[in-house]
Each structure stands twice: as structure tokens, then as C-alpha cells.
């Protein structure tokens, strides 16, 4: 509980905890890479901290995570005035490799994406600031789906 309070106090003071700073750096690199891949055609947009229930219309797995969980990032394809989700991206810290509860939540997120035919890509925190790595992941994804 103290850690949670510390994070909230830090955010209230305008000080970003490490994870938020890492996520923001990742989002900046992700956005930059996406723009470079599509040469600023503005074909895609990225949203951060998206509720799983906002991405998919139906809960095929009937799991609480569907209603409570969030994706770190979702890439949407612009189609007219609509935005269609095409890719979920999770930024994974060490807890994703060491904590059984977090690993189970990750398995459920993977299953939800699989049930809805949407790819989920997991990126280790240590790569969050590595632009070329992030661009490579996106180029690999788009080369397979387009």
C-alpha cells in the first residue's frame, strides 16, 4: 500500500515514477517509428492504457480481466472516422518474468487477444528507449499483415 501511495503522491507532484517515464519514452519511440514506417500518412494512431473491454466488443473468454484489465498500448488503424484496433503492445518489466500473478494475467491477456484474432506484442522494459528495436518490431508486424 505504501508503494501505491508513493506512486500517486509522485504523480500528484508532477514527478513521474520510473515506469511512467519508461512508458512515455516507449510511446514517443513507438509513435516516431510508426510515422517513419508509414511516411506520415497518418494511417495509424496509438492509444495508451486502453481498457480491454474498449478494444473488443464481446467477452469470448468471460474473464474478469476482460472488464478490469488494460493494454499498455493499442495501435489503431484509421478508417474514415473510425479507429479499428489492430495491435496490442505490452511493456513488460521484471515482474512479468518473476511474479506468478502477473504471469497469469499476461496469459489471460494473450488468450483474449488470440480469441479475438488480434496480435499482442510484448516488449521488455529495457528496450523501451531503443528506437531501432521498436521500429524493427513494427516493421516485422506490418510486413506480416500487409
Regions found by a protein language model. Give the residues of each.
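Nucleic-acid endo/exonuclease domains
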Residues: 1-146
Amino acid at each position: 500500500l505504501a508503494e501505491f501511495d508513493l506512486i500517486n503522491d509522485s504523480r500528484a507532484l508532477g514527478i513521474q515514477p520510473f515506469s511512467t517515464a519508461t512508458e512515455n519514452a516507449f510511446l514517443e519511440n513507438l509513435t516516431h517509428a510508426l510515422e517513419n514506417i508509414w511516411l506520415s500518412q497518418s494511417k495509424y494512431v496509438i492509444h495508451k492504457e486502453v481498457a480491454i473491454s474498449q478494444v473488443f466488443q464481446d467477452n469470448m473468454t468471460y474473464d474478469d480481466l476482460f472488464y478490469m484489465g488494460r493494454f499498455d498500448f493499442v495501435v489503431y488503424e484509421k478508417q474514415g472516422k473510425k479507429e479499428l484496433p489492430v495491435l496490442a503492445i505490452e511493456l513488460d518489466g521484471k515482474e512479468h518474468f518473476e511474479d506468478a500473478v502477473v504471469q497469469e494475467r499476461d496469459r489471460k491477456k494473450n488468450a483474449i487477444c488470440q480469441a479475438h484474432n488480434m496480435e499482442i506484442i510484448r516488449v521488455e522494459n529495457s528496450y523501451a528507449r531503443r528506437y531501432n528495436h521498436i521500429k524493427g518490431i513494427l516493421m516485422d508486424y506490418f510486413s506480416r499483415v500487409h
